[in-house]
């Protein structure tokens, strides 16, 4: 099935809701970190979302796992995905949610550079190069600021979030290279979540001596939100959108996520609002937009 070369109103509305939910997810992770160790929380998220995915496959009468080389690729995607979220959850222990969102969304730049070398027909263009320069300038601006909540360990958290962004980009490239149009969206989703469980659990056992040290309704709600709303519903919706619409046009819309994430971090977590952060945010967002820009623009 060929991809539609435009985003209709339904796609635009869906993308807006998805990016809003993704932005709020960083606040949800901050809440769950108050009572559940971060990597174990990520493991729980993958377990719960995988169970939801298994039931979905059974209901839709889809095969659960492939028996050919696609299974190997599924394992690789799961390992990359697991390493990415280990970095995200650990990084949020040391840095602000607002900064985390910015660094995670370096991923589209990793994809743009990687696609130039590894994917046919997806070359670096002038708008993409301008976007890369603008985005990394924005990252420099953010690093130059020191919010009132700054700690000596914040740099470690920032590095972990940047690593997560690189891993996210690598996962996307791997899927495009080896799995796109060869498996159904539900299988890409299921492989990512299911095969991330072992690596997350192993890392949690090694690094986290205690998994649960506090539990209340807010923490439980946070974990359920991350597992069902984010990991199951929005990821599955995202893969279905990729299956139907132009990927470059879809990707352009993800620059709304850091905006929502920063706003939620400031409004709900009372995180510091700095000049450098507010200067860097639109630069990073515009950079992401330019990386995904086409000569005809974004048709809606």
Predicted regions and their residues:
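Transmembrane alpha-helical segments that form core, pore/gating elements
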Residues: 53, 111-112, 149-208
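Glycine-/small-residue-enriched transmembrane alpha-helix faces in small-molecule transporters
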Residues: 1-40, 79, 83, 87, ...
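Specific transmembrane alpha-helical segments of multi-pass solute transporters/efflux pumps
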Residues: 21, 25-26, 54-104, 140-141, ...
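Juxtamembrane helix-entry segments on the extracytoplasmic side of multipass membrane proteins
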Residues: 7-11, 34-39, 43, 65-72, ...
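C-terminal-most transmembrane helix of multi-pass membrane proteins
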Residues: 2-4, 13, 44-49, 54-58, ...
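Helix-helix packing/entry segments at the starts of transmembrane helices
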Residues: 44, 100-106, 174-197, 227-267
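Hydrophobic transmembrane alpha-helices of multi-pass small-molecule transport proteins
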Residues: 53, 75, 106, 113-114, ...
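Specific alpha-helical transmembrane segments that line the substrate/conduction pathway
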Residues: 40-51, 80, 89-127, 132, ...
């Amino acid at each position: 099935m060929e991809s539609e070369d435009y985003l209709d109103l339904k796609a635009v509305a869906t993308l807006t809701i998805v990016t809003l939910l993704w932005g709020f997810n960083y606040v949800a992770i901050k809440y769950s970190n108050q009572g559940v160790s971060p990597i174990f929380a990520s493991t729980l998220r993958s377990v719960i979302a995988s169970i939801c995915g298994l039931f979905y496959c059974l209901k839709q009468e889809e095969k659960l796992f492939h028996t050919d080389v696609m299974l190997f690729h599924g394992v690789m995607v799961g390992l990359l995905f697991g390493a990415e979220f280990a970095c995200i959850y650990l990084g949020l222990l040391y840095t602000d949610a607002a900064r985390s969102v910015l660094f995670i969304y370096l991923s589209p730049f990793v994809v743009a550079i990687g696609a130039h070398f590894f994917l046919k027909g997806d070359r670096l263009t002038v708008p993409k190069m301008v976007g890369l320069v603008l985005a990394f300038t924005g990252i420099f601006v953010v690093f130059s600021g020191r919010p009132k909540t700054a700690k000596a360990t914040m740099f470690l958290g920032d590095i972990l979030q940047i690593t997560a962004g690189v891993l996210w980009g690598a996962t996307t490239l791997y899927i495009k290279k080896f799995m796109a149009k060869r498996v159904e969206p539900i299988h890409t989703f299921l492989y990512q979540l299911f095969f991330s469980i072992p690596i997350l659990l192993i890392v949690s056992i090694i690094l986290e001596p205690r998994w649960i040290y506090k539990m209340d309704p807010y923490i439980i709600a946070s974990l359920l939100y991350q597992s069902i709303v984010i990991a199951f519903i929005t990821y599955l919706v995202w893969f279905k959108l990729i299956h139907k619409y132009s990927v470059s046009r879809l990707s352009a819309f993800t620059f709304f996520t850091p905006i929502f994430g920063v706003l939620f971090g400031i409004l709900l977590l009372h995180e510091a609002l700095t000049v450098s952060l507010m200067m860097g945010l639109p630069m990073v967002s515009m950079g992401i937009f330019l990386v995904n820009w086409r000569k005809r623009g974004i048709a809606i």
